[in-house]
Amino acid sequence: MKKTYIRALDLRHGSVDLSHGGGGRAMVQLIGEVFGRAFDNEWLRRGDDGAVLPAPAPGERLVMATDAHVVSPLFFPGGDIGCLCVHGTINDVAVMGARPLYLAASFILEEGFPLAELARIVASMAAAAKAAGVPVVTLFVARTFATFSGGFGCCPSSTPRR
């Protein structure tokens, strides 16, 4: 069945409005057209609020880290808030002795934030996640701009904890 929306999403000149964080059709459209295209994978295609992931192998433990990124400016020499979010979270999992496996992401978007800049940040996150081989398997969008992320990995049971 084809999804229908009230209006087309103008990724070049449009901006985020309150309906994009309201849980309705506008949010579904934003997630599908911006996030879904960039992070496309089997978990996100299901459209669920979470992801059911395989259990760690026998002899391994699950490692999880969470992070938040609020920086100004959002784009800076050498990167942006998107790649910082992915690399920072993957690093937090790795320093615990784990092999990063999955990412969860939350976006708090300000009303009026340019959709072109959002698409650029999401593309940067997707490129960083793809380069690391760590997919974003669940995400959330709400109102006002910040990124939050969680990372999951596995490590041998014998790995010492800090």
Regions found by a protein language model. Name each.
Residues 62, 69-70, 99-162:
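Glycine-rich anion-binding loops of enzyme active sites
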Residues 1-95:
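N-terminal glycine-rich phosphate/pyrophosphate-binding loops that anchor nucleotide-derived ligands
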